[in-house]
A protein has these predicted regions:
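Short, charged, amphipathic alpha-helices and their helix-cap/turn boundaries
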Residues: 7-16, 71-83
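Context-gated lysine
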Residues: 35, 72-73, 199
């Protein structure tokens, strides 16, 4: 039996966990709560009014207003709305895989890893490889703030990828899921190793990787979805 895409399974798992933890649960996305996170994801996928502000700074005020409007809805209603793609480009498997694999994995982990006693998940090889394929692409933009050559290496297979070219790179080694969390600027990760020139390692570790919670979609999202924000009522 063919499994759903990792992006779709992570979407469902995020929704399940959000309901268990409740709307006020903390996340690793700045000071966002679980409800803020769910509201943001709905805006990203469904709002013609608010989504452009995630990309275009002068429109960010509209994004804030739309976040506030959507956030007035009942948390359970919002979570169940997020479970489905609706009539958006994200319902297309190729788009979902390209845009949402990291999106929903990172945000699911934002909920998981903000809780006391979290542990890394035992993902199978196929899921780790899906994360690896995605971070090889999006990681190039994520490491720009470091300003140094960067390579990543999987501990399970030994595969390597260059994220920023140059001599004497900082080499980040670990499981793909942990590499993803580090490159998205999350401070909750396990089992990572760093090799290379000390100054390059220091630059990578202190660069403030990832994007701020209000802007972290810039590298992930396609053109705004074609469903009107009025679907939220």
């Amino acid at each position: 039996m063919t499994r759903d895409l990792l992006a779709r399974r992570e979407r469902q798992a995020l929704c399940d966990l959000a309901l268990v933890l409740g709307e006020d649960a903390p996340t690793l996305s700045g000071d966002w709560t679980a409800k803020d996170l769910v509201t943001h994801l709905l805006l990203r996928e469904h709002s013609l009014v608010g989504a452009p502000g995630l990309l275009i700074r002068p429109l960010s005020r509209l994004t804030d207003l739309e976040m506030a409007r959507i956030g007035k809805k009942d948390f359970t209603v919002l979570v169940e709305r997020l479970r489905g793609h609706g009539f958006t480009p994200y319902a297309i498997p190729a788009v979902d895989r390209a845009v949402n694999t990291l999106e929903y994995f990172v945000h699911h982990e934002d909920l998981r890893r903000a809780q006391p006693g979290w542990t890394s998940r035992d993902l199978d090889r196929a899921d780790e490889s899906a994360l690896w394929s995605a971070i090889r692409v999006f990681g190039r933009g994520l490491v720009r703030p470091a300003g140094v050559p960067v390579r990543i290496r999987r501990t399970d297979t030994g595969a390597e990828a260059t994220l920023r070219r140059g001599a004497d790179p900082a080499v980040l080694t670990g499981m793909p899921q942990e590499i993803v969390m580090f490159l998205y600027g999350r401070n909750q990760h396990r089992g990572l190793g760093f090799t290379g020139p000390d100054k390059h390692i220091e630059a990578l570790r202190t660069a403030g990787l990832g994007l701020s919670p209000s802007r972290h979609e810039l590298l992930l999202r396609p053109h705004p979805a074609v469903v009107s924000c009025h679907d939220f009522g």
